[in-house]
Structures are given as C-alpha cells and as structure tokens.
Regions:
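N-terminal, active-site-proximal structural segment of metallo-dependent hydrolase catalytic domains
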Residues: 1-92, 99-109, 182-183, 233-234, ...
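Structured beta-strand-rich core segments of catalytic domains in phosphoester-bond hydrolases
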Residues: 1-22, 71-169, 173, 244-246, ...
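Metal-dependent phosphoester-hydrolase catalytic domains
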Residues: 1-12, 182, 189-203, 208-402
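Catalytic metal-binding/acid-base residues of hydrolase active sites
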Residues: 31, 78, 168, 208-211
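His/acidic metal-ligating clusters that form di-metal
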Residues: 143-150, 154-163, 177-205, 210
Length: 402
C-alpha cells in the first residue's frame, strides 16, 4: 500500500474553511496496448498473460479507484479502449472526461478527467504539435489544457489551469521536444491569463520524456534557457551515445510558427505590449526606452517562459541520494513523468520581463511515494502482476488559498 507523505506543515485552522480548497491530481501514463505490442522487446522480462489488455485494465482501474484523485491526467490512452471501456468506467466513478487523440494514424492520446463534485469545466483546449507546413514539427504528439472552476470556494472568479501532455520520445530530437514544450506553454499562457493580466494557479502534468536536471527540465523549472552550442541529443538528458550531437539551430523553430522566444503567441505578446505602453506615465518614458533596448539586445538563443514552477517530486531519496523512478522496462529505469505547479502566491517571473502575477497560490500538502529501480526489479520491473503499466502513477495533494 503506497502512502501519501507529508511535504509541508499545513495550517489546520478551519475558522474560515471557505478560504481553502484541497484537491488531488494524478499523472499516469497507462501504456497503450498497441504501443506495448509494437515494442514487445521492452517487455521480455514479463510473463505474457500479464501484458494483455484484459489483464491490465482491471489493475489500472483499481489503482485509479484506490488513489481516488480529483483530477486525472492520463497519457497513452488508446482511442478504441477509451470509448468502450476507459471513459464509461471513469464516468461511473464521477469523472467528466476530455480527450485529445494524437494526430496522424497514432492509436492513443491524452485524457484529462475531473470529479464533477469538485470542479466544473470552463474550457477545454487541445494542442496539436504537428504542423504540415513546418518540417521540424512532423510528429503527432499532443497536449490538453483545461480551465477548471473549483466548487465550494469563495472566489467565484478563481480557476485552476491543468495541462496534460506527452512529448516526443526520440532522445536525439531535443529540438522537437523544446518546440513542442514552447507550443504547450503558449497555449497555457493563452488559457490561464485573466482579464486583469494575472495568472490563475497552474498544474502541468505529463510524460515529458526528459530526465531531471536536463536542459529541458531546467527550462521548465527556471523559466530560462540559453541553448547556444547545445547538442540536440543533450536536451532531454536521455541520449548517452555519440549520436544526436548536432547543435541546435538558431532559432530552433521558424517565425512562421507564431510563437516568440518567451513561449507566447506573438499576437498575444504584441497586444500585451500595446496595453503596457498605454499605462505608462510621462516620467517613465526614459526608463521604458532603456528596457526596450535591453529586450532588443536579448540573445537569439535565449528562451524564456512566464511561470515560476515547482516540481512535486525531488527526484532523489533524501537519505541515500538514490534516484526515484517513474518508468521501468527492459531498456531503461528513470524519471520522465512530472507534476509541476505554481507554488508562490502573487509571485512575478524573475527574468522573463513579462511581469505576470498569480492570483492565489498552490500549497503542496503531500505526494504519493515513488520507488527506486532496485525496488522495481525486486518485483520483476514494470509491468508486473499488480502494476500494469511501464510507468508509475504520480499523485499530489494541493491546497488553493486566498
């Protein structure tokens, strides 16, 4: 039985309970059956019968029932099984489900589901990373960005933005991964920003096919990346062979994509700049001119985004320093799955220049414990008799406060 471990000291004062809203979020790559069968060499360590969908689905559903998250961010959800089994089963548990299938002829996609007793849906925004007119973006990965309204909360205007994605696997194509991430961040900015220019709280989940402290991971956490001289095979930290040593081009993605170096839709960025200019007073003109010069001198290899994100997991066990693992099969045992969140209340971005403010903040109350590679191989790796994906579920409990 896995446990929720306490992450921080929580104020238990319930004098004003309407000022708090507690909820849980799960991120889980459930392993598409077609992808399992197409990559059977990864599961040679498994007994054949435990790899069938008829065996795996009851285990996956039992895990979801046991953890009972308020929001589910699922990846590798196979479309034919989603319609006939997964969606009906989750609806019977009180979830509303949104689904985005991968483009092309890919069999699976991302599903984000939420308890209707805890949230109502304000908007559902699918993101397709394929662009037929941009050779770089020839892969069929997708994302899904939901805006959810908490029930039983005093601020009727407060919403939570939940993003779910599964980035490209190929370890040697960090250029594609970074561009897919920029596209997701641009859509999150578009969905999460309010009329007053503030952001609502954010939770970003998924399989990012990148290891902790890789350049892609650090970009998400720190909000900035200078990619000058960076090899495409080093972006995600997965590639250990000499292959993938080609250096990232400058710029990574073409102007025709319509996304700036700040990972914002360019039209949205132009509008924001116009509104900012109208608000400036006469005595700040000189200062504004200086700031414009600084922006103009920004290196073309500088990427930024407008969020301050924390990771629910620390990725290493504090006592031993042994790495936590979120996926394990015959070829690999690493962390590639994450839950990121906006932890700081009314915090401004440090260096992007966006000047965004968050309304409210998320406090991490607890998380589901992960295990080490050694722990997993003690039960014959993944999938096994009780864990029926090659990934482990992540789970976090948050508190939304004024």
């Amino acid at each position: 039985m896995k446990i929720i471990e306490e992450e921080t000291q929580v104020n238990q004062d319930n004098k004003y309970p309407w000022e708090k809203f507690d909820f849980t979020v799960m991120s889980y790559n459930i392993l598409s059956q077609d992808l399992l069968e197409d990559n059977s060499h990864l599961y040679k360590h498994c007994q054949g019968h435990i790899l069938t969908w008829n065996y795996r689905f009851p285990n996956i559903l039992a895990e979801i029932k046991q953890l009972d998250a308020d929001v589910l961010c699922l990846q590798e959800v196979q479309e034919n099984q989603y319609g006939t089994q997964i969606k009906p089963s989750l609806e019977a548990l009180g979830y509303h489900c949104e689904y985005k299938m991968r483009t092309g002829r890919k069999p699976d996609g991302c599903a984000t589901c939420f308890k209707t007793s805890k949230f109502k849906l304000l908007s559902s925004n699918p993101v397709e990373f394929f662009r037929h007119n941009i050779p770089l973006l020839d892969r069929d990965n997708v994302g899904l960005v939901l805006l959810l309204q908490p029930r039983f909360y005093c601020k009727t205007t407060t919403a939570i933005c939940v993003a779910n994605t599964h980035l490209l696997y190929n370890p040697r194509r960090g250029d594609i991964k970074l561009t897919q991430l920029a596209m997701l961040l641009a859509e999150i900015t578009n969905v999460a920003i309010r009329e007053d220019g503030h952001f609502c709280p954010l939770v970003i989940c998924g399989d990012f096919n990148s290891v902790p402290h890789s350049p892609l991971y650090n970009f998400l956490r720190e909000g900035k990346l200078n990619y000058e001289g960076l090899a495409i095979g080093k972006v995600s930290g997965q590639e250990r062979s000499p292959r993938g040593n080609r250096i990232l081009t400058i710029p990574i993605w073409p102007r025709s994509l319509g996304i700036s170096q700040d990972c914002v839709y360019e039209e949205q960025e132009k509008q924001r700049e116009k509104e900012k200019e109208k608000e400036e007073i006469e005595e700040e003109i000189a200062k504004n001119s200086e700031e414009v010069i600084v922006v103009a001198k920004r290196l073309p290899t500088d990427l930024h985004h407008s969020f301050q994100l924390s990771s629910v997991y620390s990725h290493y066990f504090p006592e031993s320093g042994i790495p936590e693992v979120t996926t394990c099969h015959s070829r690999s045992a690493v962390t590639v799955d994450y839950i990121f969140y906006s932890a700081t209340k009314d915090s401004r971005t440090k260096e992007s220049g966006a000047g965004y403010v968050f309304d409210g903040g998320l406090t991490l109350l607890g998380r589901l414990s992960l295990v080490s590679e050694q722990d997993l191989w003690a039960v014959n790796g993944l999938p096994n008799k009780t864990n029926s994906s090659d990934h482990l579920p992540l789970l976090a409990m948050f508190r939304l406060e004024e």
